[in-house]
Amino acid sequence: MGIKSLFGFGQARDKPVDKAADAGYSFLFGRTTSGKPVNERTAMQTTAVYACVRILAEAVASLPLHVYEYQDDGGKKLVHDHPLYYLLHDEPNPEMTSFVFRETLMSHLLIWGNAYAQIIRDGAGRVLGLYPLLPDKMDVQRDDRGNIYYVYSRNSDENPMFKEYGDIRMKAEDVLHIPGLGFDGLIGYSPIAMAKNAVGMTLACEEYGASFFANGANPGGVLEHPGVLKDPSKVRESWNSVYRGVNNAHKIAVLEEGMKYQQIGIPPEEAQFLETRKFQINEIARLYRIPPHMVGDLDKSSFSNIEQQSLEFVKYTLDPWVIRWEQSLQRSLLLPGEKGKYFIKLNVDGLLRGDYQSRMNGYAVGRQNGWFSANDIREMENMNPIPDEQGGNLYLINGAMTKLEDAGAFAKTDTGQQNTPAQENSGKRGKR
């Protein structure tokens, strides 16, 4: 098999195949150089992968998700009465909340590289519900006319009470598909598959450590006998049954027939086990672009740089995923006549908020310079608005400010000079 056939370069573009379901993609999974098999489920058994997936999935699921309407003046209006608002913000289907739905799909994205959901529509094409679909059971194809369609394999593991199994063909408009990074723009590649050796080494390190401590943190040793043993394996098994394992650690050994026990020391390279594990944790964090302090590595973190790292997490890690979600939701859920009128937005502003004093200073600058009203500030602080008659929507500026070209105009009069307000007040006091 050549490298082109492995990556599918030789295939025609009008026949895209879901690489996660294609046999030609299996080289990305399976055995690794560490000897450990890696797939989506074994990868989640490592704490680093589980932590990274959980951080990103919960971050996307917790963001406010709203439907907005474009306004003629260039602004936007939150539309609570749009049918999609309740589905996306509260309950996409009777079985799960919006948080659980988004958390599930985001987990699929981070593990398989693709997220799918079935779209239930009424006769007019309006969305009635969204149901997650497992990516490893989905195949993406094109028909002879070049139209994309989806084939979902349903079996008893998914729903034991359902009696009809087999492949279900769905139209593109009936599937919400959010792809991750991919080479053809249609199918995303699994991050776990692309980094299978790093994940495999992490699994191997964890297994090695577990085995080491299962033996009582004893690296092993040699039993020396002055004579010739007829059955060495029997002596070894007898020794291990009595002295091997955590429960048998620190027992006093009794040697017979002149036998001696010589312990084997831990080689220096094996003594670096903790450093190896720490490196592998950072390797997985690098895969998902997660700051080390968010997965528990605080070696190079301080009070001053953790806030900056958290802001960079929102900007460079979370924002690209948010854009993928927003554009996929708009493309799949909005009707053709709605796409120029409405848009769907995940709001990350709450994650970019600074400490209380910094926010108040920023609000003060915006308020004094006219780009914030009192209600603008109260909305960002999740407070109720002030009525219009009390000036809640007024935009104010400092009255002492003037244009540069008018800087000296107040001193001029028709005859030459004009008293300043301070001079006028001084003159009035003198006349009294």
Spell out what each predicted region is.
Residues 327, 331-334, 365-368, 428-432:
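Viral virion structural and adsorption modules
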Residues 1-286, 290-293, 297, 303, ...:
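Structured, contiguous alpha/beta core segments that scaffold functional sites
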Residues 292-303, 327-340:
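Short acidic alpha-helical/loop segments enriched in Asp/Glu that coordinate divalent cations
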Residues 332-354:
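Generic long, charged, amphipathic alpha-helical segments
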Residues 315, 319, 330:
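Conserved nucleotide- and phosphate/pyrophosphate-binding catalytic cores
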Residues 272-276, 280, 310, 355, ...:
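Secondary-structure capping and boundary motifs in well-ordered enzyme cores
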Residues 306-307:
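Small-residue-rich helix-loop
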